[in-house]
Each structure stands twice: as C-alpha cells, then as structure tokens.
Regions:
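Juxtamembrane helix-boundary/capping and inter-helix hinge elements in multi-pass membrane proteins
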Residues: 45-48, 76-80, 87-93, 213-223, ...
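A generic transmembrane alpha-helix motif of multi-pass inner-membrane proteins
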Residues: 349, 362-417
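Membrane-interface "cap" regions at the ends of multi-pass membrane proteins
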Residues: 1-38, 45-49, 61-62, 66, ...
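Generic alpha-helical transmembrane segments of integral inner-membrane proteins
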Residues: 55, 59-63, 103, 131-139, ...
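Helix-loop-helix junctions that connect adjacent transmembrane segments
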Residues: 3-4, 9-13, 51, 124, ...
Length: 417
C-alpha cells in the first residue's frame, strides 16, 4: 500500500475499542481455566489456609494492576511491560519482561485449552480436542480485534450467568464436615506456594495493558479497565472459594481435579458447570492468543524476536504471523505438558513479568505516578517471594526457559541481528 506521493505505508493496529471492550477482554482472560482448575493445586499447597493464599494473591495482583495502569497511562503502546521496561529500565529488563510474558502466557494458553477439553470430552480425547480449540481460536484472533472483543462479551456474560446459578445450586446442596473444612495447615511456605499458584488465575489483566495501540483514549481507558476488571474478578474468586470450602472443605478441594463439578455432584446443574468451564476456558484462550501475539509483535519491532513477526496484516489489522507462531507454540506445549505443569510454568513466567512491571512503576517520576512508590516496591517483593515459593519443577523449567531467552538475545546482538 502506498500514499499519493508513492511512499510505502506500513499497516498498523487501529484504535477500535472502548473501555467496556477492554474490561470484557480482560475479564475473558481472567475468568478462565483458573476458576475451574487453580483451586485444586492451591488447596493442596496451602491446606486450611487456602483463603489466606487467595487474599495474598489478590493483594499482589492489586499492586501489579496499579503499576500496570500507571505505566499504561504513560506509554500507551502494544507490548505491555516489555515496552514499559525498555523505556524505564532499559532493553535487557524489557526483554526479560517480554520473554516472561510470551513464555508464561503461552503455558497459560495451553492450560486453558487443556481445561476446556478436560471438561468436555473423555480422557483419551483431551489433547486432540485441545489442539482443535487452539486452531479455531487462533483463526478468530487473526480476523481482527473487534471480533475478539465481540466474542469476549458473549463468553463473559454467559459464564457469569451460569456461575451464579451453579453457586446457588451448590449452596443448597449441603455442607462439608468440620474436619474437611479445617483441613491441614501446611505452614507459611504452603501459603506462599498456594498464592503463587492462584496468581495464575488473576494474571489476565496484563492482556488489557497489551491493547495500548487498539483502545481509544488509552491513557484513561486502560487504567480504568484494569481496575474494574480486577475488582470484579477478586469478588468472583472469593465467592467461589467460600462456596467450595463450605461444601467440600479445603481437603475436598485438594482431592478433586474438578472441584466445582464435584461440589455440584450428579444434580441437573452438572452440565451447567461443564458449559461454564468450557466457555470460560475458551474466552481466556481467545484473549491470551491476542495478547501474546501483540507482545511478540512489539518484541519483533525491536529485533528481540525475528523481525518478520512484526508484520501487521493490511486487511485484518492483526499481527498475523506472530499469532500463527504463538498458536504453533501452544500446540507444542499441549503435546508435552499436563495441566498442573502448565499452571506452575505459567505462574513463573508471569510473576517475573510483573516483577519488572512493579520495578518500572517505582522508578517513574512523581508526576507520572498514580500511587505511592512503596506499592510498586511491595508488588515487586511479593512477586519475587511467590516465584521462589513455586513447585521445584516450575522453578527449574522457568529458569531454563529464561536462560534460553537471554542466550538468544545475546547471540542476536553479537551477530548484529
């Protein structure tokens, strides 16, 4: 495409979304597989202190959200903390954030697809169906962000309505024995590990920050959307946790791979749980693919990933190549990861991403801050503690992937790429 003067025009992203659209896309990313799968490993880790883990994860998520909103107001561009980190801290911290987001969220997407399939088909069909779901939703994302936003609105509305009915049915069904409600106390480390695993369920608000080039009036809309979205999700997760503890107890949650389905039992509401889980997982997967693709595009613009991934499709205004590569990477993880491994691996990458987010926000000048410096410092410290508390397999896998990423960037710089 060229101008009348014969100059080549490079297609770019377009500002088509309002605050409501951004909130819905963020909710679609947060009300996902975490609601239906993260409580089990978190209850196994935290035991009777599951609610303490939830409060801790919520507090750190709040600090991260404030830092994300503050940075988005100053740097309304695609890439989220990858872009913010480069501007505030320099290219290497920015790369670490971007790599953490791409790797961690790719694992999140694999977890979403596996959760969707787990709730809809028998065991032998889980991975094939998860593969098909990824292929279809990558295709939807490639058609444009307005289609992504429309799909998110439908999915989020349906999931919230279904969950309201399911929670009422569960509460009417009875209560857990006192010893199941009390559970076992696994100590401070268990609380921290539980919070780290539950953080997987909150981290979708990062998707809103990656919309910097597609939201109208981003300096105002993105901070508002992040705050509204996180507030809704914290209330929802607290309600679900309280209901599950009341009906199953923390011991019962830890023993069930599908705690909401177990709480419903064989009642008429079981299909509603399955439909809600499927829709929520698909909604999160839809939002994740778009967010990862845009961060990969931003990294490719700076030569931190292959330059070809920076291309924007002239008709659909989407980073088509980046999203296709992201889709392929998700399929690889589905082939080799189980759900629990994907959740732990995702938490590692995303917590590192938010560690850089909080440090960047704390370094901003006073006139750019939306909150006190100590909030960013506390958020960074919280992320560091939760990373160190994750399961050993997640920590080792995360360190290996970051070593690969840092080696890749160092090699590109040395070769002049």
């Amino acid at each position: 495409m060229r101008t009348q003067d014969g100059e080549k025009v490079v297609p770019g992203l377009q500002r088509r979304l309002g605050t409501f659209d951004a909130v819905m896309i963020g909710l679609g990313a947060m009300i996902g597989a975490g609601l239906f799968s993260a409580f089990t490993p978190a209850a196994s880790a935290a035991g009777s202190a599951l609610l303490v883990s939830l409060v801790l994860a919520s507090a750190i998520a709040y600090a991260n959200a404030r830092s994300s909103a503050q940075l988005a107001a100053r740097y309304p561009t695609s890439g989220g903390t990858y872009a913010y980190g480069r501007e505030v801290l320099g290219p290497w911290p920015g790369f670490i954030a971007g790599w953490g987001f791409v790797v961690g969220k790719t694992a999140s997407a694999a977890a979403m697809a596996l959760t969707f399939a787990t709730y809809t088909v028998p065991g032998p069909w889980v991975k094939p169906v998860a593969t098909v779901a990824v292929a279809v939703l990558v295709g939807v994302n490639c058609l444009g962000v307005t289609r992504t936003a429309a799909a998110a609105r439908i999915i989020v509305t349906a999931v919230l309505a279904l969950l309201a009915v399911v929670l009422i049915v569960i509460l009417a069904g009875g209560h857990a024995p006192p010893e199941y409600v009390a559970g076992t106390n696994h100590g401070v480390f268990g609380v921290l590990q539980g919070a780290g695993l539950l953080f997987f369920a909150f981290a979708g608000y990062a998707r809103i920050a990656t919309l910097g080039e597609e939201v109208r009036n981003p300096s105002r809309s993105i901070p508002r959307a992040i705050g509204i979205g996180l507030g809704i999700v914290v209330v929802l997760y607290a309600a679900v946790a309280l209901v599950l503890i009341d009906v199953l107890g923390t011991a019962g949650i830890a023993q069930s791979p599908k705690p909401l389905a177990t709480a419903v039992g064989d009642s008429w509401a079981l299909p509603l749980v399955q439909v809600a889980a499927a829709l929520a997982s698909l909604g999160a997967l839809l939002a994740l693919v778009a967010g990862i693709g845009r961060t990969a595009m931003a990294m490719a613009r700076e030569n931190d990933l292959p330059r070809a991934l920076s291309a924007v499709h002239p008709r659909f205004a989407t980073p088509l190549r980046a999203e296709l590569v992201v889709g392929a990477a998700i399929l690889v993880l589905i082939a080799f990861f189980d759900l629990g491994t994907a959740i732990g691996f995702s938490s590692f990458g995303v917590l590192v991403y938010y560690l850089i987010t909080n440090i960047s926000a704390a370094r901003q000048p006073k006139n750019e801050r939306l909150g006190p410096v100590w909030l960013g410092v506390a958020g960074a410290a919280g992320c560091a503690v939760l990373v160190a508390s994750l399961p050993v397999s997640a920590v080792i896998g995360g360190l290996v992937m970051f070593t690969v990423g840092l080696g890749y960037r160092a090699t590109r710089l040395r070769l002049g790429g």
